[in-house]
Amino acid sequence: MAKIPSVKEMEDFLLQDSKTSDLVAAGDTNAKSPDTKLTAHQVQHEVSVFSRVLINVYCGWPFHDEILKRRVLQILTDIYKNAHDMTSLELLEQLKQVIKIIPDNHINLNMVGYHKEVRTGLRKQRPNVGSNIAGDEKFIIDLKNDIGIIGIRTLSKWSAEERESFDKQWRAILPKSKSLIVDIRDNGGGSSRPVESLARYILGHRYPAARKEIIRNNPDANAVKKLYKNSDIDKFNVDSADDPVIYSDHSAEVLPKFDPGKAGFTGPVYVLTNGRVMSSGEIFCTNMRYYPNVKFIGTNTRGGEVYGYNYAYMLLPYSHMTFNVGCVYRDMFVENFELNGYKPDIECEDGTDAMDVAFAQIGRKNFMVHQKGLEK
């Protein structure tokens, strides 16, 4: 009977055709056509580089179970052993098998410039509870009588001027608001700083987002850390430690109780969510869970905080596809977060607008608000 290889033996086989110096950040690399021809040897090298990123750089690899690892490694081994001349698009279709089974809503393989992107196949359909009030804008802030309304559709690619304007506007309306509605529906993430600043002001204190934040510590992971030297990864001093993983541990912290005297806002807050909310969009939910007078209205968020912190965009050498992975793993306070996201306090049925439910909660059922991006 043939010996069944261990996970470590399967990993070593796939890593033999690449080295640390093959780990290159995507940067502004020119896109290549999906029809780019790859030789069998180039395919094998691409698979090995892909495997090196997955096994040694990707923050989630140590935390996935052995069954999943074996499935992934067997797929990659089969692609490697059966390599033949093919196009970049054909290779993407083969590597898709790996991405689709990893329960991570951030990890993706992207053929830049050609709208060819592969993400996990584990996303769930959520009910339609309306779209973000900001419509096509990044954010919108308004005050209707004594109700503050903040819609944040995206946190991606904000300019310094936009961040300053956002901060100035919400600081202007909160003192005049008795209730606050924060609409984060459709918010797939970006930089979390604007929403963390808002949450910290409301709470009067910064609370940890996770029990632990964990980073890989090996030559490949540390090389990638240097490629992204201006990121938050710098707070982990990996070069001076021998542990395979290093973490900042919040699990034993005594969390401060909510203090109305220090809080910037003490009225009811209604946070609107849907199934497209993930990543930095969910960080506002993570922070506001500590607020005693908050209700989440809508549907479960997607679940995208465990593996998506500090993204690394890694280049595959011949196809110029980018393999994008998180570098910091978050041990969340919510179990199975990546599969379930945050569950709302008030769950809306399909076709029910979460904004209407929020106003009903406030007791203004007949109060009409102009809603950009929502059809009445």
Give, region by region, the residue ranges found by the protein language model:
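Low-complexity, Gly/Ser/Thr/Pro-rich intrinsically disordered linker/tail segments
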Residues: 328, 333-376
